[in-house]
């Protein structure tokens, strides 16, 4: 697996890889200087078939985005149960960093894909929601809105697949923010929503894993 600091890549490579990724494109449009901060704390990964991108049990603060290829998620110890597939455009790795937990699954580059290209950003640079000394409010809001949307989408998928499950409607009980936008108050609310949604998604995963074992 090849890993390269993103800020060391050529501008052409950065533009070709991130130009079509809405999150990074919006980050650049918000503030090119803050975008450079992201680049300095991000890495580009090229994983060949069968190579491990994330290993269950490891502890880190990386937030991942799949740009090209396909990844397969395996659960269990050892990682033998295929539980999900990650396709281009998806965010992953957010639950562990939100809940401050070890990685719960192993993610491997699909053996049917020639190469999988991933960008990962060190989420520790975001600090606590009220800490605006490094990453500024607009960029934090962009990332947290994206994570909340991603988590709600994953939970909606589970709801559609298992409509009679006891967890099916729980994510809809997590209150949306109704106050002034583009404020620290909104950011704090998004952080709270993200943690609750991540916790619920973990509960879903555990429940479905138990069901598979029975």
Give residue spans per PLM region.
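Cytosolic regulatory regions built on CNB/CRP/Popeye-like sensor folds
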Residues: 1-214
């Amino acid at each position: 697996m090849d890993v390269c600091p993103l800020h060391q890549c050529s501008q052409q490579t950065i533009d070709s890889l991130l130009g079509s990724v809405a999150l990074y494109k919006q980050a650049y449009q918000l503030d090119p200087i803050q975008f450079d901060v992201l680049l300095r704390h991000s890495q580009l990964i090229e994983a060949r078939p069968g190579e491990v991108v994330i290993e269950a049990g490891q502890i880190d603060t990386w937030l991942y985005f799949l740009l090209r290829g396909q990844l397969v998620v395996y659960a269990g110890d050892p990682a033998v149960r295929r539980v999900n597939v990650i396709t281009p455009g998806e965010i992953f790795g957010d639950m562990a960093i939100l809940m401050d937990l070890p990685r719960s699954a192993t993610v491997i580059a699909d053996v049917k894909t020639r190469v999988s290209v991933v960008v990962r950003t060190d989420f520790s640079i975001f600090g606590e929601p009220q800490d605006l000394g490094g990453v500024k409010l607009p960029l934090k809001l962009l990332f947290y809105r994206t994570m909340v949307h991603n988590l709600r989408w994953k939970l909606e998928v589970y709801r559609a697949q298992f409509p009679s499950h006891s967890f099916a409607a729980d994510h809809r009980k997590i209150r949306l923010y109704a106050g002034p936008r583009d404020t620290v108050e909104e950011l704090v609310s998004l952080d709270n929503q993200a943690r609750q949604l991540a916790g619920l998604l973990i509960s879903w995963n555990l429940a479905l894993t138990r069901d598979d074992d029975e």
